Amino acid sequence: MAKTSMIIKAQRGNKFKVRERNRCPLCGRPRAYYRKFDMCRICLRKLSNLGQVPGVIKSSW
């Protein structure tokens, strides 16, 4: 879980665009972020297993 200070720091605008980091809005995780779903891989997996992410289905072959 990300520290509260790091989440607040990421919300502030940076002087340089390159320094901005995408964060998961649910848990604040900065890594493994999926832009399409606007969340990290862990939250994406948790919510998709519950069926709360539209368009995501479990694959079977």
Swiss-Prot record:
Required cofactor names: Zn(2+)
Keywords: Metal-binding, Ribonucleoprotein, Ribosomal protein, RNA-binding, rRNA-binding, Zinc
Residues annotated as binding Zn(2+): 24, 27, 40, 43
Gene3D superfamilies from the UniProt entry: 30s Ribosomal Protein S14, Chain N (4.10.830.10)
Cofactor: how and how many bound: Binds 1 zinc ion per subunit.
Pfam families per the UniProt record, alphabetical: Ribosomal_S14 (PF00253)
GO biological processes: translation
UniProt cross-references to InterPro entries, sorted A to Z: Ribosomal_uS14, Ribosomal_uS14_bact, Ribosomal_uS14_CS, Ribosomal_uS14_sf
GO CC annotations on file: cytoplasm; small ribosomal subunit
Any GO molecular function: structural constituent of ribosome
Family: Belongs to the universal ribosomal protein uS14 family. Zinc-binding uS14 subfamily.
Quaternary structure, from the entry: Part of the 30S ribosomal subunit. Contacts proteins S3 and S10.
Function of the protein: Binds 16S rRNA, required for the assembly of 30S particles and may also be responsible for determining the conformation of the 16S rRNA at the A site.
Protein name, per record: Small ribosomal subunit protein uS14
Organism in which the protein naturally occurs: Citrifermentans bemidjiense (strain ATCC BAA-1014 / DSM 16622 / JCM 12645 / Bem) (Geobacter bemidjiensis)
Lineage: Bacteria, Pseudomonadati, Thermodesulfobacteriota, Desulfuromonadia, Geobacterales
Gene name for this UniProt entry: rpsZ
